[in-house]
Amino acid sequence: MEANVLRWLPGWAAILLLTAGTVAQLATPAPAPADAPADQFSATRAYRHVRVLGSHVHQVGSVAQDTNRRYIIDQLAADGIDATVQRGVGASTSLGAGSQLAEVSNVVARIPGRHPTGQVILVAHTDSVRVGPGGSDDGAGTAALLETARALMRGGRPDNDVVLVFTDGEEACLCGAAAYVAAHRDQARDSVVLNLEARGGGGPVVMFETSRNNAALVRQFGAHAPYPVGTSFAVEIYRRLPNDTDFTLFREAGFAGLNSAYIDDSAVYHTPQDTPAAMDRGSLQQHGANALALTRAFGSVDLRHQTASGDDTYFPVLGLLVRYPGALVWPLAALAALAVAAAVALARRRRLVTLPRVAGGFGLAVLPIAVSAVLAQLGWALLGWIRPGYAGMLTGDPYHPGLLRLAVVLLAACVLALWYVLLRRRIGGVALALAGLSWLALLGLVLAALVPGGSYLAALPALFAAGGLLVALRWPVAAPVAFPLGAAPAVLILAPTVALLFPALGLATGAAGALLVVLAGFALVPLLTLTLRGRTAGPVADTIASPAPTADRAEPVTVRRGWRRPVLLPAVLLVSTLVAGVLGVATSGFDARHPEPAHLTYALDADTGRAIWASSQPGEADRGAAQRWLSHFVGTGTEQVGDRFPVLGGRADGRMRTGKAPAVDVPAPTLTALSAGRPDADGYATLRLRLRSPRGAPILGLYLPHGAAVRSVRVQGKPVRTTADGRWALAVTFYAAPTNGITVQLTLKGSVRARILDESDGLSGLPGYRPRPADVSPAAAHDADEAVVARTVPVSTRPR
């Protein structure tokens, strides 16, 4: 290796160490022991609750959920906290085009403050999905609230009231939160909500959502949370995605607050594998320690002044939270653009570049951005071909994603290095460096306009990298220090973002992580340029100050005289990519501990007597254990099932893989008239109906076809909206329905043929069903492993 390369090794070593240290700071803390101080949070103590709460499936309305509710009340009572149960019907429209309702039972407890100006509301949901025990989701949040409440009672009450809300029915429809918010909407002004969630088995706890005008909230979070991991970019993205938690309903009702969750190891999410044993107790420690500290922080301030006039930009750096006002987003983005422009002008004045070459490099910089993204997606497609079961993973992540994520990072770095090596002779290294920084500056401006909380991802790396280049151009002797320092902010900002983005979006969207790696790489290209630069008579730093002999020369020294094997860099990265990828694939297989998901549902059309097995999972019959098991029930072709069984997921067009199933002899749901009013002048009349499942299924559905003249609807006394999605004028799902059914009040004109259905959990008692093998498990879907019975009934306002 040339002496020139050796001179820059300390800078590269510092960058690599900084990268490793930045990512390592995201590691979860060690769980505090059971004998930790009584006023502190202990994951070991909290985990005892997790083992009880997550020992069985406990969906809304189940006997197991009632058992867990009594346990929560008993634990609160043992700590001297009185709890009440809020029972009622919650209604939500957040999870789809229709309306979802449920009979819910929230546990609500209050710790009175000494001098309250408002209340801190701690929220976690107590129910699980219908196929998994919810060890993390949301056993972690529930246990953290119980341990936080215990610590608060031992450490002195805060000034403000603390309200503990253990919601019911979150997984089904957010209906517990809906019921609580509906009853306490008037408390939004002087409250701060802290919602605790989990979407996986571990990883750092990320504060991923806030209410608007979050500056005061973020200030408290950064100052008091012992493990403050959160980014304003995540908040901006989450606001634009159709994802919802209980916090959604609080935020929409005007409550201020923060939403936190751990999201890694997401292959267990909403599956039978979400057990207490699968939980990272360090994640539980971080969840609870943050919740306790923030409760005390918000409990000691005047909650009448916890909203500001804008949002902060913030991101984690080495265990701290860096933040600045949103008002600085545009000035910093503009300053970054000016710094890059100044670097281009100074480099041109030094005759190191020409504008055409910088422009050419700017255009060609699209290549590493696009190619790395495409290759990352092709890599996921290849993994899906090798391991077909990953097509059925809800979050798009395998069980052991670490090596595969590393492969994506190395692949993006390889593409960027190859781009540089191939073009530096034609374009020039300095021109390519400036082109990359120009892309960062441009993206900083674009994000400032479209996603203000994410502008820092590009603007700050561009600003500091351009600053380092300007210093080196002006004072060449400072280059060995200026370039690494200029590149360091890109590492500090983008390395943790990449590490957090992979579990957030999954390898199925690996292109996003690859893109951020390339952006970080653009900030490192100036350092790479000096590293691979040719020898000169003087020190290496002098080369950036040496004018070219002609005005159109892009490099003062020919590359041929530099490091003779620059192609080794992309070659090493390519080999590393392949090694990480092969090892990642080898360790990402399925077994009894890490089973392959398989989606299956039974559906009976009571009108025709025809029953089917249905699966939303694509695939071929001989590709993997899940597909071999599914082949006993469904074929590879698809059938339109959405019109007959609208509750089934399937594809957007309502098609699913199907197979003939034995028809079970069970009674179909009924819709009976209780009363009918007289039609008004426009022909509308109000009908009172009862929808019931004679077989005792806990979920009921009512659907009216598009074109039905429906003026208003109330279900169990709650108004619900009508939809206009092209298929159904009304779509209602009711969870945890009473055994005597639910009351529906329709104001309708004319006649309509309603589609009604009921849903029950489990397939094991059905004729023709074969149990899954040990290495296959139910899929993470709300309609997995359920039996649906549907029929069509006439509804009319006309007298018979």
Segments and roles (model prediction):
Residues 30-323, 703-706, 722-749, 798-800:
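Soluble extramembrane regions of membrane proteins in the secretory/endomembrane system
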Residues 20-38, 581-598:
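C-terminal region of N-terminal signal peptides and the immediate post-cleavage residues
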Residues 70-110, 117, 142-143, 216, ...:
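Extracytosolic and intramembrane catalytic regions of membrane-associated proteins
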Residues 23-26, 307-311, 383-388:
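Peri-membrane helix termini and adjoining interfacial loops of integral membrane proteins
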Residues 188-207, 330-352:
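C-terminal domain-closing interface element
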